[in-house]
């Protein structure tokens, strides 16, 4: 199973660098940035040994382009168990349950991480197959 990390409108270059570093530490390199902030020296410094993850990242204008080839789209959220006009929930799994479900799987997974201030929108969560 191939995992693509998708950062949706990241606000802070340091966070992009930190995600790239964490990705490399766990053996991932496929990063897609949806309408990102500028990534300059600080973001690259935070990436440390994972600078090539940032340099190889694909930058896209919309979420649809970022997830178009994915067989499974997984959204992340800190809000659980509510359905309101502002918070839409699709099937929810814990990180452990997701890992168990993905073991031995084939295809491509897009793992969406939302904005630092507002997370993923209701519309973006609706595009997900699973929420963690």
Regions found by a protein language model. Give the residues of each.
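Post-transcriptional modification and biogenesis factors for structured RNAs
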Residues: 1-132
